[in-house]
């Protein structure tokens, strides 16, 4: 594992993330900033893609339809529970 200067500073100064190190100390070490960004990007590229994956519209529509069905089912169950708990709401 490659340890960058910002990682060391983050641990020593008890920052919660590397971005905090760049915000606080970035103006003091401007000449090293681009090198640290390159190293961090190289490390991060091993864990995550550089661009988000596209989601097909049919997948989105399917999920929205499922959400609609769940919401509709919830409203039906809610109505049944309310009418069960309040017998005077029953109509013949």
Curated annotation (Swiss-Prot):
Q: What is this protein called?
A: Putative lambdoid prophage defective integrase
Q: Which key words tag this protein in UniProt?
A: DNA integration, DNA recombination, Viral genome integration, Virus entry into host cell
Q: Which family does it belong to?
A: Belongs to the 'phage' integrase family.
Please provide the Gene Ontology terms (biological process) for this protein. Answer: DNA integration; DNA recombination; establishment of integrated proviral latency; symbiont entry into host cell; viral genome integration into host DNA
Q: Where are the bilayer-spanning segments?
A: none
> Does the record bear DNA repair in its keywords?
no
Coiled-coil regions listed in the entry = none
Q: Does the keyword tRNA-binding apply?
A: no
């Amino acid at each position: 594992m490659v340890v960058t200067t910002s990682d060391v500073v983050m641990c020593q100064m008890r920052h919660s993330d590397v971005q905090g190190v760049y915000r606080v100390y970035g103006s003091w070490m401007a000449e090293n900033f681009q090198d640290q960004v390159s190293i961090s990007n190289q490390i991060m590229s091993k864990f995550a893609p550089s661009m988000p994956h596209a989601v097909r519209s049919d997948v989105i529509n399917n999920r929205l339809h499922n959400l609609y069905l769940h919401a509709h089912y919830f409203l039906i169950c809610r109505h049944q529970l309310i009418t069960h708990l309040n017998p005077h709401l029953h109509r013949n």
